[in-house]
């Protein structure tokens, strides 16, 4: 066993040019873990707090020196001397020291960076790859799978400066036999989509997550462009590739009148009408997964949507559940959605993240491991997806090195594990096995 001897926090830059927190945890024996906190654009109101300085003279108020100071002072003083492998104890120490419901004293960005850096240092001290150590922490040592990628190839909503209301249009290469093959298929469709958009005189500029961000007449147009790209790449939509969407509905939900206002299309829907709008898209295209298909507070709308679509479509709660076991437990009891999106920084520690994945799986929900729109070269989510055998991962498109870092780490892991980590493909998606 190796004790923590030093903790260092620093301000680094994320993929959107904003500061974020990086933590370095040193153990006895010279073992070091380095981790950075990601940052979201479309955020759930009940997420753990990302602490920003608010000093307009630095980074337009988005500096994180307060969170870094918490790492270097209070957090460091509290955990130096503790065993590096005592992950849950270290996480709980930080949570208790913060003392707030949403980690607003130190910031979830500070606590998470230290939590993940600790896990990396501990894995190194045990001579284990991070995914193997995560599997041990998860209580499932040696149980792995390679995740099916949800590849966000058209960006809209808060992730792009365009008129497309739905935030993410994704492809899932279900016909692949391996993760590496899935990435090849995704790349081929991505490049063909660029050609399709250019031929239509549309922009091939990319959004925060590496997908294209053209102005389109409708959400159905985005799906039609993807269909054309899939076919041009030589694949069959529905057989080789299925589709997924992240509506991020809270971003266009008007709380005053209770309507979903899709300004890009000039349409407004009631809660039930929006479910049927999505249902019609699912009839026209092989959409097998929909994320945040209602506003985070519209639980009646989610219940109706689950009743209408839940037996044939994976309904993923992101802003709905915010990786929080208290909220997820209530959702499970009420039969809301059937899957959860897992984002480390929504809850703020590795221990709490693993608890959310376990609760979801125990209830028959799927868990989709996810990046944020503001990312770094940190690829921990790749190891999390494999080490928990989650089955699915969302980490952007086939461009931007902050996204590709995760895919490349998955390639390395698949190579190392071979048959020990099966690629589940379509079977990983709720309702599709």
UniProtKB/Swiss-Prot annotation:
Single biological process term from Gene Ontology: glycolytic process
Gene that encodes it: eno
Annotated organism of origin: Haemophilus ducreyi (strain 35000HP / ATCC 700724)
Subunit structure: Component of the RNA degradosome, a multiprotein complex involved in RNA processing and mRNA degradation.
Protein name: Enolase
Pfam families: Enolase_C, Enolase_N
The organism's taxonomic lineage, starting at the top: Bacteria, Pseudomonadati, Pseudomonadota, Gammaproteobacteria, Pasteurellales
Binding locations of (2R)-2-phosphoglycerate: 167, 343, 372-373, 394
Domain of life according to the entry: Bacteria
PROSITE patterns for the chain: ENOLASE
Annotated Mg(2+) binding sites: 246, 291, 318
Function: Catalyzes the reversible conversion of 2-phosphoglycerate (2-PG) into phosphoenolpyruvate (PEP). It is essential for the degradation of carbohydrates via glycolysis.
